[in-house]
């Protein structure tokens, strides 16, 4: 059993009520993020490859990388954040590493990831 206080553990479990799809590094995902502009709120999509995932209960996070106008953009999202509206898995990537930081140095065809074929 973990050394966390039972009250803290109960609160964290309650806040982790959001249904998050199963995804892994190498997968291409679309994250819908709530953005507040002035007095209105809208959803902004961020689509890219998951290059890292951190599983720490309520403090879980994942990093998504995409190329926008020839510039690499990475964004780290807290999995259970209220600002993250939804996560949709577009395609499954077949990779052997947990952290795909090597993609930062690659561009073009060498940065492609094989698709995982369903069995």
Swiss-Prot record:
Transmembrane segments: none
Any one Gene Ontology cellular component term annotated for this protein: cytosolic large ribosomal subunit
Cell inner membrane found in the keyword field: no
Protein name listed in UniProt: Large ribosomal subunit protein bL19
Swiss-Prot/TrEMBL GO biological process terms: translation
Gene3D superfamilies: 2.30.30.790
Domain of life: Bacteria
Entry similarity comment: Belongs to the bacterial ribosomal protein bL19 family.
GO molecular function: structural constituent of ribosome
Keywords from the UniProt entry: Ribonucleoprotein, Ribosomal protein
Stored NCBIfam families: rplS_bact
Function: This protein is located at the 30S-50S ribosomal subunit interface and may play a role in the structure and function of the aminoacyl-tRNA binding site.
């Amino acid at each position: 059993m973990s050394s966390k206080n039972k009250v803290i553990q109960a609160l964290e479990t309650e806040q982790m009520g959001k249904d998050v799809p199963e995804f892994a590094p190498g997968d291409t995902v679309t994250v819908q993020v709530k953005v507040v502009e002035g007095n209105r709120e809208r959803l902004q999509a961020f689509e890219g490859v998951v290059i890292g995932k951190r599983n720490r209960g309520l403090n879980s996070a994942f990093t998504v990388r995409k190329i926008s106008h020839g510039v690499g953009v990475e964004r780290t999202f807290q999995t259970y954040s209220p600002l993250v509206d939804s996560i949709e898995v577009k395609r499954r990537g077949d990779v052997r590493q947990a952290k795909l930081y090597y993609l930062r140095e690659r561009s073009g065809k060498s940065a492609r990831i094989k698709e995982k074929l369903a069995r």
